[in-house]
Amino acid sequence: MTTQLKDINGAYAKAKYIRMSPRKVRRVLDQIRGRSYREALIVLEFMPYRACEPVLKVLRSAVANAETNRGLDPVDLVVSHAYADQGPRLKRFRPRAQGRAYQIQKPTCHITIAVSAEAS
């Protein structure tokens, strides 16, 4: 998908190794995909999920990349691609009764957001 992102008329940003479940991040990304930059900002500001903070940070970075590298106006930008891939799992151990230990897996994810100029 990365080669496809480089071909779009816009910019993208990534955040890697975010200590959050990709499933929970996708719930937020599904709400902003296809929306304009301003709408996406408003939606992310008022959603009650913990995943909104890193998604908002990546979205702002993608828009800054579009402004700086491509010279695009933020008013015309639309979230064209937004997805979360699974990252490596952090493995931890929790002590249990009678000297045993259970393995706890803490998920991570990689967030990618691409913005492109609106076709109007």
Swiss-Prot record:
TM annotation in the entry: none
CDD domains: Ribosomal_L22 (cd00336)
Top-rank lineage group of the source organism: Bacteria
PROSITE patterns, alphabetized: RIBOSOMAL_L22 (PS00464)
MF (Gene Ontology): rRNA binding; structural constituent of ribosome
Listed Pfam families: Ribosomal_L22 (PF00237)
Keywords of this entry: Ribonucleoprotein, Ribosomal protein, RNA-binding, rRNA-binding
UniProt entry tagged with the keyword RNA-binding: yes
GO cellular component entries: cytosolic large ribosomal subunit
GO BP term, example: translation
Listed NCBIfam families: rplV_bact
PANTHER family: CHLOROPLAST 50S RIBOSOMAL PROTEIN L22-RELATED, LARGE RIBOSOMAL SUBUNIT PROTEIN UL22M
Oligomer and partners: Part of the 50S ribosomal subunit.
Family: Belongs to the universal ribosomal protein uL22 family.
Function: This protein binds specifically to 23S rRNA; its binding is stimulated by other ribosomal proteins, e.g. L4, L17, and L20. It is important during the early stages of 50S assembly. It makes multiple contacts with different domains of the 23S rRNA in the assembled 50S subunit and ribosome. The globular domain of the protein is located near the polypeptide exit tunnel on the outside of the subunit, while an extended beta-hairpin is found that lines the wall of the exit tunnel in the center of the 70S ribosome.
Protein name, per record: Large ribosomal subunit protein uL22
Organism from which the protein derives: Acaryochloris marina (strain MBIC 11017)
Gene: rplV
